[in-house]
Amino acid sequence: HMDRVKRSTVIQFTMEEDLNLPEDKPDISTLNLEKGEVVIEEIRPGTDEVTVRGKLGYAILYHTQETGSNLVLLSGALPFEEKIHMEGTLPSDTVAVNGTVEDFTVNMINSRKLNLQALLLLTARIEEIYDEELPVGIQGGSAGEGVEYRISPMEVTELSICKNDIFRKKEEIPLPSSYPNIYQILWSNVSLRDVEFKPQEEKLAVQGDIQVFVLYEAEGEERSIRSYETTIPLNGTLECQGCREELLPDIRYSLVRQEHGQPELTIQPDLDGEERILGLECALELNIRLYEEEQIDILRDIYGVTKEVIPDTRDASLRQLLARITGKTKVTDHRKTDIGSPVLQVLHSEGIVTIDHQETTEEGIRLQGSIDLTVLCITENDETPYVSTREQIPYEYTLNVQGVTGTDQAEVHSELEQLQVNLLEGEELDVKAVLSFSTTVMKNIPLEAIEGVEEQEIDSNVLAGLPSAVIYIAAPGDDLWSIGRKYHMPVKTVRELNALESDELRPGQKVLLVKGLA
């Protein structure tokens, strides 16, 4: 089995909605943080099109001047249904669709009404699994004397396991004793770092880190705002029938988001009944592909010595693993904040790595994009102390892949491995990040597969035109096979006549050929 991308399409579309605050929400003073996430609910392939139904989940944090909490969370989802035109699509096709939010903007119309604008990107891919039947020898009349055939070994990469699965992780995260109890969660962010998959016998090992940030309103009369950030290990195994240690993994993963765009994070009581535990239910959607490298012998060419042998061929394509590459790059930048109030502290930062341009060069795969950065700060303004700023930090990096071409299949996965944002003098942010890129490059090997042969008598004029004996001077690219084909002689005969140990020739080497020897 082998796999390939049958076709892929990318579309952009916009969403806009005026949103009235629910009656139980206090008036808006100023907006603080906003986040949008695409949740795909249904994919329906049709004839030459794919219908995608989903939601734009949103979370909006704002300040209020009313009594009670200073910060208020507003979350929900907006439904959408889009048709993606894909020429050649059939209802029986299996289509994968990924959705991302390219831009999400929230504007305040008045204290009770918001305007939401979003630019969404949908990427649809049809991947197919196919088999290539290739000849390994000849039988019948052509297998006898007077016919030369060449069998060559080839390294191919076969698809051993292909499936989708979900890896689940439940974790209870207790607050340190110095932190007050939780009344309600105002904002949270869950992200993955350094995720790796290792094939084992009948299972997949998963390891990495989960970074958790939570901004919450504490219990008590003051209802103070506190934040807590921690990193917990992501590890475990997933049952995978047929899995073996020697298989090569190419696994794409994504964090399952709830309707509001975040994994499930709840408040749970501890043994004393106090609300001091964060309950995290984390689910990873996995697109699992495990490959196996194998050497196979293929009939590549055939010609006749005493008769004309005409092969019937068709175009075929094999896959070969070129490289499994991971590369990292550091990105640093200084950004002047445009917050308005003097900043006291950087409370939290989060970012998403986007690849805007991918190009194959002589050095490898050149990537250009940005880190979409959100920074939450505490300011001197007592009425609206929490303020956020968004920045785009550009990067450029080349994954060093020797021998890659534009026809090879290489899907690059990007990850924000480290992020540190510090406050400098003069309201300037110092950004330091480490980006990680990984890809599995599959080389497409086109070849002509021999499906059959037709035998004919050799034209007597062709045989008559061959010299009785000749000294042939090898040109670049010549070998005994090409010479034997040209002069209708067996390769073994030419080799023995010239006392050669191999079929390879160097340019300018002299080869004696005698007509009629077999």
Predicted feature residues:
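Membrane-lipid interaction segments
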Residues: 1-466
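Extracellular LysM carbohydrate-binding repeats and other cell-envelope/extracellular binding modules
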Residues: 489-518
